[in-house]
């Protein structure tokens, strides 16, 4: 059984989360510079049995595309070109950053650590993946 990788793509940084092979457990994985994200994922496919990429779809509250949508769509095209054997599913990413901050506050994470944008990106990717896996179980 393959793993699923969630991608929280941003203008500067991209956060990743990965499932276990049984798709039961989500782990916050790593944050990389966005310009290196596709090649990082290509390397991951050599070390992990990845069956699907779940990419956060940036939308406004009224479901219209956010200003990051063109960058995300370009990233998706590039990802499909470089790794054509793995499908890319778009998933609504609204509220993932808000939830990431809330989880850190409720978890007692100190303010200085909550300002680590890479941590927020990884946690947002983990929330995205957890939401996707819960959807699959329904």
UniProtKB/Swiss-Prot annotation:
Enzyme category, top tier: hydrolase
Major localization listed first in the record, in broad terms: cytoplasm
GO molecular function annotation: nuclease activity
EC number(s) reported in the record: 3.1.-.-
One matching Pfam family: RuvX
Keywords (A to Z) from UniProt: Cytoplasm, Hydrolase, Nuclease, Ribosome biogenesis
Localization per record: Cytoplasm
Cellular component annotations (GO), alphabetically ordered: cytosol
Origin: domain of life: Bacteria
Gene Ontology BP annotations: rRNA 5'-end processing
Disulfide bond annotation, renumbered to this chain: none
SUPFAM superfamilies with a match to the protein in the record: Ribonuclease H-like
Role, per record: Could be a nuclease involved in processing of the 5'-end of pre-16S rRNA.
UniProt similarity note: Belongs to the YqgF nuclease family.
Protein name from the UniProt record: Putative pre-16S rRNA nuclease
Organism phylogeny: Bacteria, Pseudomonadati, Bacteroidota, Bacteroidia, Bacteroidales
């Amino acid at each position: 059984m393959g793993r699923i990788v969630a991608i929280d793509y941003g203008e500067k940084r991209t956060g990743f989360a990965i499932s276990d092979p049984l798709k039961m457990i989500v782990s916050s994985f790593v944050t990389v510079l966005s310009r290196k994200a596709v090649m990082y994922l290509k390397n991951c496919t050599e070390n992990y049995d990845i069956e699907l990429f779940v990419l956060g779809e940036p939308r406004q509250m009224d479901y219209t595309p956010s200003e990051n949508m063109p960058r995300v769509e370009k990233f998706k095209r590039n990802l499909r070109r470089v790794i054509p054997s793995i499908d890319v599913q778009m998933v609504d990413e609204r509220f993932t950053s808000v939830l990431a901050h809330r989880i850190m506050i409720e978890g007692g994470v100190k303010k200085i650590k909550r300002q680590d944008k890479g941590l927020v990106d990884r946690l947002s990717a983990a929330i995205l993946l957890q939401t996707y896996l819960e959807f699959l179980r329904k």
